[in-house]
Amino acid sequence: MAPSVSGKRVPTRTKARKRALDILFEADLRGLPAAEVLQAHTEQAEPPIREFTAELVRGVVANQADIDALVGAHLPSGWTLNRMPRVDRNLARLAVFEALHTDTDQAVALAECVLLASELSTDESPTLLNGVLAAVLRDARPAV
């Protein structure tokens, strides 16, 4: 683990998630394909892009339509993905992909998303994302 600005150690996967968010956010902001932004970051990045970062970005890209439909179906009345702040929209995509398509525990993916939202977005974002993503994950679980 590497130290953060606050002096606390930041887990490797947490850093990879943040970097994936940076790439997805940049692509969204600039109107570019996320795969293109990932490629540019991979060629220029120091330190190098971690495989987990690339896996997250590629996974969101490959599953974005399905992820957006899941998130959109669980937004509060009157809300759309486009109404969400860019950071929140991309955090939601990242968390849903990670929770449903990787070996990461769903609770961990949700908690990491909420933590990043509390650091990077509005005061209301952690609560909104927690509620929306908890509903998405609850409904996406296979019936036992």
Tell me what each language-model feature is:
Residues 1-144:
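N-terminal interaction/assembly modules
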